[in-house]
A protein has these predicted regions:
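Hydrophobic face of amphipathic alpha-helices that form TPR/SEL1-like repeat modules
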Residues: 1-3, 26-35, 39, 62-71, ...
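Short coil/turn and helix-start
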Residues: 1-8, 19, 33, 37-41, ...
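Ser/Thr/Pro-rich low-complexity tandem-repeat tracts
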Residues: 17, 23-25, 53, 89, ...
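Short, charged/polar low-complexity linear motifs in solvent-exposed/disordered segments
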Residues: 21, 43-45, 80
Length: 108
């Protein structure tokens, strides 16, 4: 399902902005792909855009990227990368990442 006409328009403009290297739009485009908002659900595309957003310094996506690596959503499971992104997110004060980082240390 593509969603409502406003979701399709939002996807269109997020896509334009994301392709011009706007990191928040890259995160939003990843969200659209992850949940099928304005486009077909595609976890590989979601991962790609979340990663671009993180690589461009958008701190709010670090924890999400850690989850994708941990669960193998749109990419191979990579616990070392998951830990790295959880740690970066926690260092930036993300409360959810403190929990995820604690679980990494607890489980090993």
């Amino acid at each position: 399902m593509l969603g409502s006409s406003s979701e399709i328009k939002a996807f269109y403009y997020y896509n334009l902005s994301a392709n011009r290297n706007h990191s928040e739009s890259q995160k939003n485009l990843g969200y659209c792909y992850e949940f099928g908002r304005g486009t077909e659900k595609n976890l590989e595309e979601a991962f790609k855009w979340y990663k671009k957003s993180a690589d461009n310094g958008y701190k709010e996506v670090y924890d999400t990227l850690g989850n994708f690596y941990k669960l193998g959503k749109g990419t191979e499971i990579n616990l070392e990368e998951a830990f790295k992104w959880y740690k970066k997110s926690a260092e930036n004060g993300n409360n959810e990442s403190f929990q995820n980082l604690a679980l990494c240390y607890d489980i090993g």
